[in-house]
Amino acid sequence: MRESQDAAGAHGWNRVGSTATKWFTGAPFGVQSHRFDISAVYPNWKKFSTFTEAPYSTRYSTQVSHIGPGTYSSKETCFSKKKLMKEVDTGWAKAQEATRLTQLPHFQYQAIMKEKRLKEQKLGPGSYNLKDFLEQLREKPCSTRGLLSSGEVRFRGLTGNYYPGPGNYGEKGNPYTKLEENAWNRSHSEGLMCRMSNKPHPRPHQGSGLGPGTYFFKSDLETYVARSVGTRGPYDTFSGDRSKPLPYGHYSMQKKKPRELMNFKSFVEELNSHHNKKHGVFSKLPRNPKTPTERIYWANLSQCPRTLATSGPSFWLPQEKKCKPVNQPPFLLTSKGSGAKACQMIMGSWNPVGVGRYLNTWLMETKDRRQRYRSLFLSGSKRYLSDLARDMLMQERITPFTKGKCPPTVDYNSDPTP
């Protein structure tokens, strides 16, 4: 039964008319198609030249698969023999035609020469017009917009803030409560005889608890008489005499202050005032000071000389150098064997701390850490055999510091020493 189904499935697969040949029997999962064939599902998204889909592509399997190096002719290209012969044959004709055209005069030769002669004749004072910088600026293309014009609409619309302004917020922090209530009232409006406000209905009248004859009501006449009424009549516009100037209002006059005697300061009070306190007092400062009191003269050394006690650049006297006999180093050397520069060059030490020193530009990886005979450079060089005791000491210092510390190297493969 299974074999009959497989045969029927294979026969059905061939009946579909697919370009690819099915090399298996049976239909996995009830589908008569290849496992990796997605051309029917995504025909436009099918990626060519892939491992699983390229063999099932009709174009890449039959039309393009035979193309390769040596499988096509060069007749279709621009380097074919026919194309090259055609170009070579027409070269001399094109060159001859170009030579003939260069020998022909221009069709506006006379007009051009006439214009050149007129320009040469017009040269002279007053015969030409030179444009100044203002005319050149006017001729330049410019914009009608100013420096601050951005070309954008200032108020295009709402910028995202749809909330009411200050003072328009509703109940419980919801600004739309009042708007919703108004919309509800408009959509559910009551009749003309109904109330239009949201006030509650008045409560029914209840008794006050007072007995009969224990209270009385004022009549309308008593209420009218008890009202507070002004004493001015309907024609009394201003209180007081109308002949006097108006004390207030639009046509009022300025009130003048009463004239009084002014208190002037006496001579003694003005002399003892705060402003005249220093008048007539002898100054404690010298009349001709060594340095001017104005700060503007302090930058000039001739007008403001510096004191000898002042410290700073160029404020001390240089010491006189004494000529000392110098013992020349041997071996025709011109530099000392000791010093800061020699210590840096030989010992590899670089101390960045100090006046005139610079930062350490050496990398720690490239720094030479080998042990050197530092004792040779602690003092100046002297001639040999000038001091025998010192020469013996120097001979001991030349001895390496590892002498006698390293174990002897023994070759156990060789014969022992007799």
UniProtKB/Swiss-Prot annotation:
Tissue: Sperm.
PANTHER family: LYMPHOCYTE EXPANSION MOLECULE
Protein name stated in the entry: Ciliary microtubule-associated protein 2
Source species: Homo sapiens
Gene encoding the protein: CIMAP2
